[in-house]
Amino acid sequence: GEISYPLEYKFLICDDQQQPLYWEEDENRVLNLPSQQVGETVIVSGLYFRDNLPLWRCAGSVIPVFSLRSEKSFGVGDLGDLRMLVDWVRKTCQRIIQVLPMNDTTTTHTRTDSYPYSAISIYALHPMYISLPDLGELADPEKAAFFARKQAELNGLDAVDYEQAVRYKLEYCREYFRQEGEAILSTSEYREFFAQNESWLMPYAAYCYLRDMYRTSDFTQWKENSVFDKNTIRELCSVEGKAYPEISFLYFLQYVLHT
């Protein structure tokens, strides 16, 4: 029937079987709204559960992932170092780890991209967080030795050299992609990842490709590509298209980061 005002109510917490666990404290709440028109929705916000339950407290650590540099790092903290932090937090009986955003922030390929809150995607992670030891070894001994020297140089710095770390980590990833990319992209795991994330992965890869092609992140300067069009994006990212070698590399980076 029709709801009449004033309406009295209370909040309660239920378990998975919808059985009441805890009613909130104090007197009933009172809701007194003016009459609504058909189809009108009224939202009452700012409400909170009133209780005398003790507040949950714990110890934890707050740190940007890029600061978690270890001997296995490549000049900047990465996901491999984050796993080491998880082990340390557990050993020290902490319960929470809070990190700064890890989203991709690449717009200029310079150190101005290092600000972690300037994300270009809410889904894509920054390629610099790829753990190269976890990614795999390069088969070419000369290239492996070259990157080992660069790793030692960057790890020996007192502070993170953002541009150099990102540059050489991406170069390593490209070498590894040339070596193993075709095999990785043909796996069922990768195909499943792509199917589940295509809605954001394809536009993200297209954006990165066009940003680098036009040498600017200002999409208004991308000529015929300045207006977003799904069909154009799908054509650009087509397996048969000339851009696909770079597009597939961008897919590969996100696959590695998310799995």
Predicted regions and their residues:
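The feature marks proteins involved in alpha-glucan
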Residues: 2-58, 113-131, 136, 149
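Acidic/aromatic-lined carbohydrate-recognition and catalytic surfaces
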Residues: 53-259
